[in-house]
Each structure stands twice: as C-alpha cells, then as structure tokens.
Amino acid sequence: MKVTKVQTLRADRFMYVKVSTDAGITGIGELHPGSGTGGTPFLPIAGVEYCAEYLTGKDPLQIERHWQHMFRRCLFRGGADVMAAIGAIDQALWDIKGKEAGKPVYELLGGPTREKVRLYTHLGGKTTDDLAAEAKAMVKEGFTALRLYPFGDFGGGHSFEEGMGLETMSFTSMQRNAVERVAAVRQAVGPDVDLMIDTVNRLTPAEAIAVGRALEPYNLYFFEDPIEPENMDAWGDVAANVPMPVAMGERLYTIYQFQDLINHKGAKYVRPDLSLAGGITNIKKIAAIAEANYIGVAPHNPLSAVLTAACVHLCAAVHNIAVQEYPHDDDSGVKRDLVNAPMKREGGYLIVPKTPGLGIELNEDAFRKYPPKPYTRPPLINPDGSLREY
C-alpha cells in the first residue's frame, strides 16, 4: 500500500488533512491553525504540502519512520506550523493503520486502559448570572468538571478566547473580578464539581500569583495557562507560588519542551494538543514523560469532532489521562454537519469506540455549505496603548 495523495480540506474555521492510498483506504486528521490565529492559516497548509513531498509514494503503515523524517528533514525544524502539519498527517496515518488492521486505533497503541473518557467543558457565560445558569445546566447534563475564563463581562459578542475586558482591568480589579465569577459558579454547582480557570497565557507572573491566591477558597482543580509559554523558570515560579495545580502545554509542541517544563516543575498537568504537537505518535511520548513524573495529561481540544475522536483514542490508551477538554458544540451545528457522526457521549463522558481507525469520517458534501473563513483574535490593547498577549 502506498500514499497517493495528501490534501488539505477547509470548512468554516476548521481544517483537515486527508491521506489517500492506492488500496482505497483513506485517513483523516484535524489541522491546527498554528500561527494562523491572526488570519488566514497559510503556514500550516504550507506545512502539509512540505510533508506531502516526502510522504507521497511511501507505505502509510510505517508511522514512526515517517514521523521522524517529516520532523527532521527540516534542518532548522519547522516550529508550530510544521508540527501542526505532522500532527494532522499522523492522525490520518493512524486512521489508515486502524482501518487496514480492522481495529480501533487505541488497540494498536497497547489496548484500552478505560472504557470511557472523563470530560470537562467550558462555560461561555459573560455575566456571573450567565455563568451560574450555564454551570447548573452542564452539571444536570452529567458533567463533573467545568472550566471558565475568570475575567470580564464581555459584551459585543466577544468570546473568552478573545479576552476583551482584561486589558482594562487594574491589578486589584483583576483579582476581584476573578473571585466574583468563580464564586458564582462554585455556589451554583456546590463543593463536589471540579472547577478550572483558563487565562489563555495573558497574565504576568505577579498577576497570576495574585489571582491564584485570591481564588484559594474555591478549591480549583487546576489553573490553566496563567502566563506566556516560553520561560520555564517563570512557570516554575508561578507553580510554586499558587495554591492550586497549574496546567500548561497547549502552545508547546515537542517532547523537549515538555521535558523542560517538567524539569522546572512548572505544571502538575500537561496539556498537549494532538493537532499541534505532532499527533498521536508524539503525544504518546509526552504522556510517558509525564507518567514518569506522576503528572496527569489533559489534552487540549479546541477544534472539531475529528480532533475529539483522535483524543478519545489517545485517552483510551494512556494510563495517566486526568481529564479531556471537550467543546460542548461538538455534536451540534457546523461541527456536527462536517462529520458522519461524532463520538458517542453519555453525560460528562465520551464512550471509547469499537470501530476501526479513528471511527469518524468527514461529510465532504457538507463542506459546500461552510466556506472557509479565517480564525482571528483581536489584539488586546492596554489603556496606555501597549499590547497584552493575544
């Protein structure tokens, strides 16, 4: 069996890689926008084309060999965009391997360690009342873990990823706002639901430590991405000075970066993204590094149902999975239209599938309804005109 074609498919803000073979077996994976969060994601698409030059004509079942070639043939390494391409292609190759073997991917990774995968979902409410109401609804639906962005009443149709409001807050109001929002959710759901916050790498270490300490009474499961991702000494400092576990890793993409994070004691949970950090092959290795240090894995999953499917197979096969991020709209709207059927969910868990490969297929006929559009975030401009992290 040989690879005959590697192509990128786009619909709405989502991108996929499809790998075709001369045996008629195809595999799919989800492509992260990488550096494309500021506009058209042409760099990860170019990364796919770069990897396709190597992969076309090769046996798709030799996944580790191909992973190493795609990673190392770029002499100065490819950064996030090439790693995103490798990650999507890797998912597709595992999909092919599972289909060829007639087995679900997790069976090829050592077999299942669990029958279902615990989820956390994000609360998108803009006011404290909205957050409390949504939290109650999610708990009623069966979720036992919830995450929120702890700043701002947004207004203007902005999402938590855009973070509008934080840039206008003083050091003191930042803490007060976080306490008000987290307290509203904790009061709504009671003491036994796990709560997390995500500040999307937007705080300074001083701000992160102050916010973390202010939230100590609310017993957070973890504090996700408090500061910018590059300086591991700073991560170790923050982790040592906040009263809850720190989770980090969605903007890292190599085993070496995660090893550095762990060596600096910068996180108790790592959050690699299968569509950014080299796919199933690489994240299985990241999880092993974490396991050797008694660190949990909480895979990042901000995209659509194909990435969710890949995450489920990884979570099934990896012992030290703590919890899996889950976009609540995975099984509705545009995301539902783009696939034949999403992973089966029962309350706050996804059921490990029995079907060969990843167990999900694209509904390419639906792509015509959803023309590609760029994924953008507005810059956060502080009152003095300076830039805060996007």
Regions found by a protein language model. Name each.
Residues 1-28, 32-36, 329-337, 390:
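Structured beta-strand/loop patches that form or line metal/cofactor-binding pockets in enzymes
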Residues 1-10, 16, 98-99, 103-116, ...:
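N-terminal amphipathic alpha-helix/helix-capping segment at the start of soluble metabolic enzymes
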Residues 20, 37, 46-53, 65, ...:
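Shared catalytic-loop signature of beta/alpha-barrel
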Residues 116-237, 241:
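Metal-dependent enolase-superfamily TIM-barrel catalytic cores that perform enediolate-based chemistry
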Residues 358-390:
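Extended hydrophobic packing segments that form well-structured cores
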